[in-house]
């Protein structure tokens, strides 16, 4: 019996595949709470699928290395809100879904500029980031060293602290906020885009590179990551190119 799944999986006729490199102008900031209680509260407030809640809480705690914090770190956590990056044995990373959200956010903003109806929904259904983990990379010194294992940042390059203010039932409160960041860095990821042009309201047809770069031109000013209201996360698109695929019979 022929395995049809093997025959049609990764059908090269359905999607076009691109690679993209974004170089951050200054820094990218982490936005995931590092204290255990904060991790639980953050996930419970943001996860819609409650059936997966406990597993996600456990996985996030592990990837944030909360069990390996020093006594000094724990003392800092007790008196501050500390946001950082997820990490594994390869280095620190942002998630592919964050980049997907960036594209959707920009689509929602520029939909009227491009005269595309339901642009956010169209991007959500057509543009996919292939990687689950997008590692934060050091500056490239030589071409073609992207896969060098030493090219990934293992930890943030710094952190800064500031005051945050909020209104509660007990009145206005202030707390110390600590944010991890990486400067002098870039990311590279793979985009899979449905192979069709978008049709505007006035019947113009936008090819994939055109509408993707419109999204990027807005996103690079809006930023990626946390603390964007403070001017962090702005970037420049250093490379955007199609990966040629060979069709198999």
Q: How should each PLM-predicted stretch be described?
A:
Residues 1-249:
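RNA-interacting cores
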